[in-house]
């Protein structure tokens, strides 16, 4: 009985082995394997297709960054334009300052003249106070100091007189027999200059030469 069972088991095992070999070697099995491979490839394609939008997102992101870069570039251009406008405005302000300096021309003239007169007065005073100077030198220096004070008084008087004629400002510089007059006025003519000369002649009888110059107020 045991031998029969053993033979039966061996027979069944042999049959299973034969069927397995037949199944593997049959065309249908190959087709099944091919279909399985195609299915796997198809699944892989789906995965690849699903991952593709990620690249598209990257492109969209790059596009967004590009647009942002353009906006930044445009903003930078606007900033540059603003800087140019600011630079142009600063340049115009610099021109205004130059014009203001022209308005201060009379102040500069006066300061220069006062400095020159102050140095001259110091030199004359040094001679008067010097122990080495002779009596004649001291007397001459003193006379020059007195004359200088008189000239300064005459200049102030003439400046005030000219401004009463409607002029904004006037600068008078008397050097010996010559008087240089600078008048601040936007309008000037030969007749106006002649009128100023006649006005000065009435105040200074001994004058020989008078020069009148007009400077614009702006």
From Swiss-Prot:
Transmembrane domains' residue ranges: 7-26
BP GO annotations: sporulation resulting in formation of a cellular spore
Annotated region described as Disordered, given as residue ranges: 33-99
UniProt entry keywords in alphabetical sequence: Cell membrane, Membrane, Sporulation, Transmembrane, Transmembrane helix
UniProt signal peptide: none
Positions with biased composition (Basic and acidic residues): 48-92
Compartments (UniProt record): Cell membrane
Biased segments, Polar residues type: 33-43
Gene Ontology cellular component terms for the protein in this record: plasma membrane
UniProt topology in membrane: Single-pass membrane protein
Subunit structure: Interacts with SpoIIQ.
Role according to the record: Involved in forespore engulfment. Forms a channel with SpoIIIAH that is open on the forespore end and closed (or gated) on the mother cell end. This allows sigma-E-directed gene expression in the mother-cell compartment of the sporangium to trigger the activation of sigma-G forespore-specific gene expression by a pathway of intercellular signaling.
Protein name: Stage III sporulation protein AH
Organism: Bacillus subtilis (strain 168)
